[in-house]
Amino acid sequence: MIVEPTVATYNTSDFRKGLKVQIDGEPYLITEMNFVKPGKGNAMYKCKMKNLIRGTTLDRTYKGGDSLEAADVETTTVQFLYRQGQDYVFMDGTTFEQYEVPNEVAGDIWKYLKDGTECSMTLYNGAAIIVEPPQHVQLEVTECGPGTKGDTATNVTKPAMVETGAEFNVPGFIKEGNIIKINTLNNEYVERVNN
């Protein structure tokens, strides 16, 4: 007797923001979900979803009792090792498996990556589809113009290059050699870590 593997499904009552589902053979993330109960008729669930591979969005409406297949995605913590041409090489610290991630998937993550940076990686059928840096990273300032005397009391900013080659706007008192904390969600300076 051959036993087929069961595929997890989500009923409409399980739908919520952040749920990963499969539609037409591709993984989607529910980004918005609204429950609508009209005066007459059955309840409906209006969902806005993002395709995790292509980045496109999709709007769908489901009736109560409908179900969707769970996406076969796995999220794991990986460490950045090095760049190889246009690819980024990461390693899973638990299994020691290495993943080569193309530039198209990695996007502008290079701004925050130095050796050993831990990132979150989402895999679909064993291939990386999303790589996210930690919310905050600490980077050394390698190049910036001199601050003007008295700038510590005002909101004067200047561009500063960090060890990854990225440029961020920092307060006027930041100097070369300072370690700064950057918020990767909005790409902004948070604070100076050392003097």
Swiss-Prot record:
Gene Ontology CC, one term: cytoplasm
SUPFAM superfamilies registered for this protein in UniProt:
Nucleic acid-binding proteins, Translation proteins SH3-like domain
Location in or out of the cell: Cytoplasm
Q: Transcription regulation: is it a keyword of this entry?
A: no
Q: Name one GO molecular function term.
A: translation elongation factor activity
Do you know which NCBIfam families this protein is assigned to? efp (TIGR00038), PRK00529.1 (NF001810)
Give the protein name, as stated in the record: Elongation factor P
Q: What's the encoding gene here?
A: efp
